[in-house]
Amino acid sequence: MRLFGYARVSTSQQSLDIQVRALKDAGVKANRIFTDKASGSSSDRKGLDLLRMKVEEGDVILVKKLDRLGRDTADMIQLIKEFDAQGVSIRFIDDGISTDGEMGKMVVTILSAVAQAERQRILERTNEGRQEAMAKGVVFGRKRKIDRDAVLNMWQQGLGASHISKTMNIARSTVYKVINESN
């Protein structure tokens, strides 16, 4: 059994020092501590990727706190399952939680349920926000293409910018912009 450590900060203002010190105090050698800073996406987690390549069956990964392993609950659960499939257990120092043994399996099951509830809650909030925005007239999707020829034809026919903007459902300033660009 080899001990590895993983530390992650989600913003550039946070420091890895406290996490790294805790990992060393727990017995992890400095060359087996992997870190990631201010990672917004999973593709940016070089420390985690290196850790994935180094660990083998029977190894243990120490992490200072539960929330330091993944960016969100779903990400954390996916990582726990991935390491569990390799025969690698994870221990969270501050939380006193370990993924090995029957108790560990139960913890993972509970966390999976929490992750599912979190995904559902996010989906509900997203839909509520979208409906609220639509009620306020926010238009989703790509900006539609303006038919510049139609705007210019109407202008040449002597129609005013206000009439053109209402007919074409575009801003009056857009009408003037199209006219000025054509000159």
From Swiss-Prot:
Keyword annotations of the record: DNA integration, DNA recombination, DNA-binding, Plasmid, Transposable element
DNA-binding region: 161-180
Residues covered by the Resolvase/invertase-type recombinase catalytic domain: 2-137
InterPro entries: Homeodomain-like_sf (IPR009057), Recombinase_CS (IPR006118), Resolv_N (IPR006119), Resolvase-like_N_sf (IPR036162), Resolvase_HTH_dom (IPR006120), SSR_resolvase (IPR050639)
PROSITE patterns noted in UniProt: RECOMBINASES_1, RECOMBINASES_2, RECOMBINASES_3
Listed Gene3D superfamilies: 6.10.250.10, Homeodomain-like, Resolvase, N-terminal catalytic domain
Active site per database record: 10 (o-(5'-phospho-dna)-serine intermediate)
Pfam family, one: HTH_7
Molecular function GO terms recorded: DNA binding; DNA strand exchange activity
GO biological process terms on file: DNA integration
Family matches, as SUPFAM superfamilies: Homeodomain-like, Resolvase-like
Function as written in the Swiss-Prot or TrEMBL entry: This protein catalyzes the site-specific recombination of the transposon and also regulates its frequency of transposition.
Family per record: Belongs to the site-specific recombinase resolvase family.
Protein name per UniProt: Transposon gamma-delta resolvase
Gene name, Swiss-Prot/TrEMBL: tnpR
